[in-house]
Amino acid sequence: MNYFSLTSHKKHRGHPSAGPSNAYQNLEKTSVLQETRTFNETPVNPRKCIHILTKILYLINQGEQLVAREATDCFFAMTKLFQSKDVVLRRMVYLGIKELSSIAEDVIIVTSSLTKDMTGKEDLYRAAAIRALCSITDNTMLQAVERYMKQCIVDKNAAVSCAALVSSLRLANTAGDVVKRWANEAQEALNSDNIMVQYHALGLLYHIRKSDRLAVSKLVNKLTRGSLKSPYAVCMLIRIACKLIEEEDIPSEELSDSPLFTFIESCLRHKSEMVIYEAAHAIVNLKNTNPRMLSPAFSILQLFCSSPKATLRFAAVRTLNKVAMTHPAAVTTCNLDLEGLITDSNRSVATLAITTLLKTGAESSVERLMKQISTFVAEISDEFKVVVVQAICALCTKYPRKHTVLMNFLSGMLREEGGLEYKTSIVDTIITIIEENADAKESGLSHLCEFIEDCEHVSLAVRILHLLGKEGPFAATPSKYIRFIYNRVILESPIVRAAAVTAMAQFGASCPALLSNILVLLGRCQMDPDDEVRDRATYYLSILNSERPELYKNYIIERENCSLALLEKSLVEHLNGDVDTRFDISIVPKAAIVKPVIANDVMLVTSSAPRPPKITREEESAARLAQLPGIQVLGPIHRSTAPIQLTESETEYTVQCIKHIFGQHVVFQFDCLNTLSDQILENVRVELTLPEGFTTRAVIPCPKLPYNDLQTTFVIVEFPPDAANSIATFGATLRFVVKDCDPNTGEPESEEGYDDEYMLEDLELTVADQIQKTRKNNFQVSWDAADSEEWLQAEDTFVLSAVTTLQDAVNTIVKILGLGAANLSENVPEGTHLHTLLCSGTFRGGAEILVRAKLALSEGVTLNLTVRSTDQDVAELITAAIG
């Protein structure tokens, strides 16, 4: 028993109520670093040095920061320990090197010692030495150890081979060109009998070849013949096969004949349960499948639901839970098995079973299921509470009449203890219910008002206040919400107080009966100690005191949100230019609607890292375009389109195009990829065949396009003066100079090349490309305000022969026009024969657009389209786009 175990034992004996102690919890960095002097003693005391190294590693892993000097001194002292032959001490030294390698300076001094251990006869050293060596190796010295790495990849010792393969995978991110040369060794390791070596070898091979789609296809086709013995490797191969199927976008009628799908389906009969589950999970998550393809996979999941192993039950019910909304009919066949899991001893399994039943069950079973889940919801973790909330959200959409039961359950969950993510999911669900179900608005707002009375999360309080300001004025009794909002001004932090001031102003602007009271409350807010709160109160008071409805609409009710990144860019340009002129905020593009990205569950790599803030495509493009010479003269960017492919995915050269729309210009961005390893392209540019009225202003070529390196060329084109002629089709040809090169080095064999060209798909410029969608909080107010001389109107009636349902008609109109739907009018209620679609947006140059589309379903779909815009040409263009 060591010293720390003995002292802990004595403490427990003398203090039976005391918990287990942590011998390292009171360490001080300075004293521990001073102890590293012990490393210089001769002979080395392994026991003492191991203890000191443990302290250092503990401090680092607890977040203690070492400055470069401290880390370097500690690192160099640690190198003295290589003279000891103690195995445990040597392994601790390797760990210390890995931890300090990113902080200390001149770490390459231990390269020779690590290389010696890596190539030595002591197998206990070799694997750890490889990992430590690769943590300090940079691109400049990697070639010096390349020979040793190749030898280790094919080493007979499985631990050594795995260490080399995993380290190679890490090095591939920084030295991909060098690691690519190790493909032959990785291929040899793939034939190993060891399951982990085979798994890591496949991972490295895929990483090396993943940018070459043809090479990946060959690898998969070779391995699907049954040469893999490792279940881990087979699982990875299933994921790679799924990725190829998704990229090829094989239609359902051809998918069953695909060799890749046949392989995945055959894995349902594998002897390993892990592989069977992976195959079933992959099939149910594939697109373009039909019930016949899904049936075997769901049968497997149904079988796993009754397994005695908790892991299999959990995996099966979790997968069923995820696909319950995409394949409800198939999941319903498992309902009896899921009912049996409601009382499962594993609370996680029980939670997933109930939430799956909530998604697929009948309306009559909602109360029973909610009662069952309420008995143990307090016992499960926040992660699974979020799953419950998501199921309730889906249920509210499916059965809107059950909103009272579900809303009461959610409000009860809001009052319980929980973290930010958990509470956010509940608030998101309540907001979704309020927006989609008018009958639930009053109760939903009341529950949220009660929540912010005792809400510790600032971000949630601000969101709820924003919602109250948007929805509260149009409730049956708006005045009852004022007390909750003003309480925030008295009791909360400055950020929340500022949000409360804005919410009160919206009540004053939308409810004339409450205006006098709101003015009094805003007047009190002018005495607030925080600048932001005072400024907002003064700003809104001046607008409300003006008694001008148009100011209410433009600056309080329908505030247009600018893209903050582009607003900042425009302000900087203004300050660097003529500051004597007034800044025109109308030239700044409106913030685009950012849709949440749905993760693909079949992806090869997932990450639990925090998600970065969502940015619009325009904000992302603005930084890149800013590097182009003279781009500033085009003004602010209006919008950027999604990329479109101009070539097939398996051709010699792949090209995709992004259209960046400005006020009077369009910048075509062509992203080019050369997939031929024996060629290097120079002076790469795209030549456009322009329709009448368009003018090319600049072509910015790509100087060099090496193998497998994505590069970009730009073409700047000016729009014709007449908006009606801005819808056009462009011919496109990729032109370049070809030079033959060495596939291994990428160096051209001669300085001379020859001109060549490659035909691309035609490129279309549509109405939707030129419109930035906006979303009006209160469309009717904006529509009524547009009934003035400043706005112009165009109207026409159409028969939409290509669609058979109102929902298809709505989807088609929104897609063609590129407008943002308001008041959830993009969703057509079931069983209706009449519907009105309300849309809004901004045309390039700043012209606002409002559209009201009245649809009627009889033998076909009849459309009455009314367009209001601040520009007559734009209104007529929108109308003509439908015809």
Swiss-Prot record:
Membrane topology value: Peripheral membrane protein
One cellular-component annotation, GO: cis-Golgi network
Keyword Cytoplasm set for record: yes
Pfam families per UniProt: Adaptin_N, Coatomer_g_Cpla, COP-gamma_platf
Disruption phenotype: Narrow tracheal tubes and thin salivary glands with reduced tube diameter and impaired tube elongation. Fails to complete dorsal closure. Fails to efficiently secrete luminal components and assemble the luminal chitinous matrix during tracheal tube expansion. In salivary glands, fails in the luminal deposition and assembly of a distinct, transient intraluminal matrix. Disrupted endoplasmic reticulum and Golgi in embryos. Null mutants die late in embryogenesis with a poorly differentiated cuticle and denticle.
Transport listed as a keyword: yes
HEAT repeats: 69-106, 292-329, 331-364, 365-401, 404-439, 476-513
GO terms of molecular function: structural molecule activity
Primary residence: cytoplasm
Annotated spans, Disordered: 1-25
Protein localization: Cytoplasm; Golgi apparatus membrane; Cytoplasmic vesicle, COPI-coated vesicle membrane; Endoplasmic reticulum
Keywords from the named record: Cytoplasm, Cytoplasmic vesicle, Endoplasmic reticulum, ER-Golgi transport, Golgi apparatus, Membrane, Protein transport, Repeat, Transport
Function description: The coatomer is a cytosolic protein complex that binds to dilysine motifs and reversibly associates with Golgi non-clathrin-coated vesicles, which further mediate biosynthetic protein transport from the ER, via the Golgi up to the trans Golgi network. Coatomer complex is required for budding from Golgi membranes, and is essential for the retrograde Golgi-to-ER transport of dilysine-tagged proteins. Required for limiting lipid storage in lipid droplets. Involved in the expansion of luminal extracellular matrices and apical membrane during tubulogenesis.
Subunit and partners: Oligomeric complex that consists of at least the alpha, beta, beta', gamma, delta, epsilon and zeta subunits.
Protein family according to the UniProt entry: Belongs to the COPG family.
Protein name per Swiss-Prot or TrEMBL: Coatomer subunit gamma
Organism: Drosophila melanogaster (Fruit fly)
